[in-house]
Amino acid sequence: MLQYPHINPVALQLGPIKIHWYGLMYLLGIFAGWYLTRYRAKVKPWAPIKPEQVGDLTFYVALGVILGGRIGYIIFYNLPYYFHNPSQMFFLWDGGMSFHGGFIGVLIAFALFARKIGANFFDLGEFVAPVIPIGLGAGRIGNFINGELWGKVTDSPLGMVFPTGGPLPRYPSQLFEFFFEGVVLFSVLWLVTIKKRPRYLVLGLFMFLYGCARFICEFFRQPDPQYGYIFFNWMTMGQILSIPMILLGAVILIAVFIKTRKNKCENI
């Protein structure tokens, strides 16, 4: 059995002000995304955005992630609780962010920003997609430090006892998601971007691979107590929300493949 490290969720306290690791992980992901996107804007001739515009894009994306992630969590996962405890909606440091809500928020942010600068929405998504897994991985580390979103009870050597998960060892599903949704997904997308490839290949890969990784990792993650298993006595809310991403990613990849076969797909 693995040992849970018991990291203090508060990274730094200045008088009454507490700075949580959870928030720092989001800031780290946003900063890394800004840095790499700015770098790519300088070296990629097809970039739909100028280096000096990356800061504004980062601001739009950060708002989309925070607002969309929080609103998505409230709507998708715990609406009755927040309906009766509305003040808790603003306690982001206690956790409670939805990737799928954040993804919708980012799509809205992309649409608004693309319209502002006169860029193509899909080109912008293709350009930014390779750096998104960094933020996803950082967020999962924040979940792990918070001791939340732990996995199912297990007798596997990979199990560990979480402070809020009861006395039995559980899968560290946050670390599984960090590895597959963060490290592996970033590595695959970044390697694909090194060489010329069909336009929108990376966008399709991101949506398809993230959806698959999340769907699989959900089998190790403890279902949300307010929902449990929704369909077939095994399908969770996270899996249901991942299916549209898998399907849309597959549609994009098939379209790219067909255009490539017909030599109608531009390489970038």
Curated annotation (Swiss-Prot):
Aminoacyl-tRNA synthetase keyword on record: no
Secretion signal span: none
What keywords sit in the KW lines? Cell inner membrane, Cell membrane, Membrane, Transferase, Transmembrane, Transmembrane helix
| InterPro entries, per database record | Lgt (IPR001640)
Q: What is its EC number?
A: 2.5.1.145
For membrane topology, the record states: Multi-pass membrane protein
The record's section on Pfam families has: LGT (PF01790)
GO cellular component terms attached to this protein's record: plasma membrane
Question: What GO biological process terms does the UniProt entry carry, in alphabetical order?
Answer: lipoprotein biosynthetic process
Pathway assignment reads:
Protein modification; lipoprotein biosynthesis (diacylglyceryl transfer)
Give a GO molecular function annotation for the protein: phosphatidylglycerol-prolipoprotein diacylglyceryl transferase activity
Instruction: Output the PROSITE patterns linked to this UniProt entry.
Output: LGT
Q: What top-level branch of life does the organism fall under?
A: Bacteria
What family is this protein classified in? Answer: Belongs to the Lgt family.
Cited HAMAP family: Lgt
Can you say what this protein is called? Answer: Phosphatidylglycerol--prolipoprotein diacylglyceryl transferase
Q: Which organism is it from?
A: Francisella tularensis subsp. novicida (strain U112)
What does the record give as the organism's lineage?
A: Bacteria, Pseudomonadati, Pseudomonadota, Gammaproteobacteria, Thiotrichales
